Amino acid sequence: MSIMKRESLPEEYIPYIRHVNQHVIALNSRCLMTVMAVEGVNFDTADINHLNSLHNQLNTLLRNIADERVALYSHIIRRRETIYPESRFFSSFAATLDEKYKKKMVSQELYRNDLFVSLLWNPTSGKTEQLASFFQRLTKAKKTQSEPDMEAIRKIEELSQDLIQGLESYEARLLSVYAHEGILFSEQSEFLHQLVGGRRERIPLTFGTIASTIYSDRVIFGKEMIEIRHESNERFVGMFGWKEYPSKTRPGMTDGLLTAPFEFILTQSFVFKSKAAARVIMGRKQNQMINAADRASSQIDALDEALDDLESNRFVLGEHHLSLAVFADQPKTLVEYLSKARAHLTNGGAVIAREDLGLEAAWWAQLPGNFSYRARSGAITSRNFAALSPFHSFPIGKLEGNVWGAAVALLKTQAGSPYYFNFHYGDLGNTFVCGPSGSGKTVIVNFLLAQLQKHNPTMVFFDKDQGAEIFVRAGGGKYKPLKNGQPTGIAPLKGMEYTEKNKIFLRSWVLKLVTTEGQTVTEQERQDIAKAINSLESLPHAQRSLGALQLFFDNTSKEGIAIRLQRWIKGNDLGWVFDNDQDDLNLDSQFIGYDMTDFLDNEEIRRPLMMYLFNRILDLIDGRRIIIVIDEFWKALEDDSFKAFAQDRLKTIRKQNGMMLFATQSPKDALNSTIAHTIIEQCPTQIFFPNQKANYKDYVEDFKLTEREFELIQSELSRESRRFLIKQGQNSVVAELNLRGMNDEIAILSGTTKNIELVNQIINDYGADPDTWLPIFHQRRENQ
């Protein structure tokens, strides 16, 4: 295929003049335009009924904004994504993990789909002027710098807001002017620049026309191929158009393109027709069939029914066109991509044509407002357009501008697109993680926590079975495995300042030690404990022990506080729990881990222990960034102190810049709790792993997953795939974490009993600095 050297000046084909305001652009035809970016809906995890409902809603929206002075363009721009979230870590392990993972991810072919819808309004067309004749003059109109009519600006802004509201389910927003490093840039110009040159870059506001600003690459047209020359590279483009429309349309006819392994621009336009013009078009088509003695009487009957639907306002009619521009770095590669693209486009029954003689017109017809360049257009209904442009896509998350800054982690979706994961959904970061043993839950949770270290939060991890011990220690944290019969290093009477608030807590805590569940406490006992705490304050810090506290009580009563406190004093059967030489909870560390597995079933110890721990953790929730992680939290929920802590903090921790992460093997564990409603409501980010034994009621009726999401979890996703479902609000996506070849890192993220013992041996010999013991650990582990 030869390239013919044929170029044109931008003003001849690009109709955009300038910004009227931050949202509205004026065209040289005096048309006005706004552009919206649309997140879209993930068709891959949505129920069919939901997609059909959205299709009906789109049709209703199109009917509501129908006006012969209005036109819509929709674009899908599929492009390679190479951006990796910015990262700086306070632990060398997290930095090494990120470096290896980044290298793996940026080498992959990840593509994203950017969806846009453009709204055009003709302010000069009177009620008696036919829109068709006006659009024929659009590209012939002379360039004008005259001020647009203020009423027209008001009208397009109103229509834009109506469109934004109607697309609420798709998360649409108006493109606008923005500032970056003190310079004003235009999102609309950046979008249009992609249509003109197929490349994304920042476009500043200038005193010149938008047309001259966005034409920065040379676009050269050949017989069947376009060459786009940039100073650093060149690209080649081939185009398809719809020659004949399919007999029926359905939502998702072009969804196959959304996973294609190449870049493209899919353009569609829809110019609304008046009801009178629609009657003429449909009547003419019906007469053609009758005059031709067409035997397909069913088609004539269908047109009768369609005319009735038109009169009943069940749809509106518009002039539509569709084109697909496919990009490649080499002509040979382009041929391969075009073959794949053709298969996707013909999947719905349409007849498509490769653009050759009309290639240049087809290219410029991608630009909203270039109506006269649409060589292949046809009349379709709003229901057809809603099916052909259903705003299906895959969520990509949010790279920047999150509550804590850049995205926590870049993940790959099942569709091969990037997903920028954040714990936060809006300003709420609480997260619920559910997956059976062996599903990969531990690796992924700890990986995300390692990535979170870029935001420098305080991290408190309540572990079970020491599964995260190696990870906490490798991340520069301090880990305290609390074991039955072994001194805990906890001494509440020595660990707290004797403020009025803390003394009130210590009174309640001592009561916990000397009473059993349901036991009545007398007012005299409360007063005695308060006096004893006040007296203990006068002692030197080192002498504030439970043994010393006992001396302030009457020891003559066989059932008094002194006797009931006896077993908690050093040297007695529970003296190892709280009567220690010093209180060392490691609260000065930025990363703290506790393992309480031994005590979860021991209510007598668990109640006062968790009461104290969570009270001290409360002091850390002071506005600093903090995440509190509780593994197998359902077991902890059996404790009243934790239950109260969780119920209160789930609702309020966001106000103090914190979040909580709850992990469990089964959703039923959470649902059995009396605060299940709070957990579901206050954890907008939910991560579910494959589970062949998943219960429909637990997942769908209680956790409100869609039937499609449940189907994915129960049957379609395998454990071996290392894929999982992320749900935030009403949106969900299937993502994967590929750590193949990163065996050293996996050994840290998911600790085995054997490796935990090895790490503790090495730390005993070489110290707790992970930069020292990690290399030794990897060497010995490989030699085992």
UniProtKB/Swiss-Prot annotation:
Subcellular location: Cell inner membrane
Binding site for ATP: G435, P436, S437, G438, S439, G440, K441, T442
Organism the protein comes from: Bartonella quintana (strain Toulouse) (Rochalimaea quintana)
A Pfam family assignment: CagE_TrbE_VirB
Listed GO CC annotations: plasma membrane
Keyword terms, alphabetized: ATP-binding, Cell inner membrane, Cell membrane, Membrane, Nucleotide-binding, Transport, Virulence
Summary of subunit composition and partner proteins: Interacts with virB10.
GO molecular function: ATP binding; ATP hydrolysis activity
Protein name: Type IV secretion system protein virB4
SUPFAM superfamilies: P-loop containing nucleoside triphosphate hydrolases (SSF52540)
Similarity comment text for this entry: Belongs to the TrbE/VirB4 family.
InterPro entries: AAA+_ATPase, CagE_TrbE_VirB, CagE_TrbE_VirB_cntrl_dom, P-loop_NTPase, P-loop_TraG, T4SS_component
Function in brief: Component of the type IV secretion system VirB/VirD4 which could be a major virulence determinant for subversion of human endothelial cell (HEC) function. Altogether with virB11, may be implicated in providing the energy, via hydrolysis of ATP, for the assembly of secretion system and substrate transport.
SMART domains, per the entry: AAA
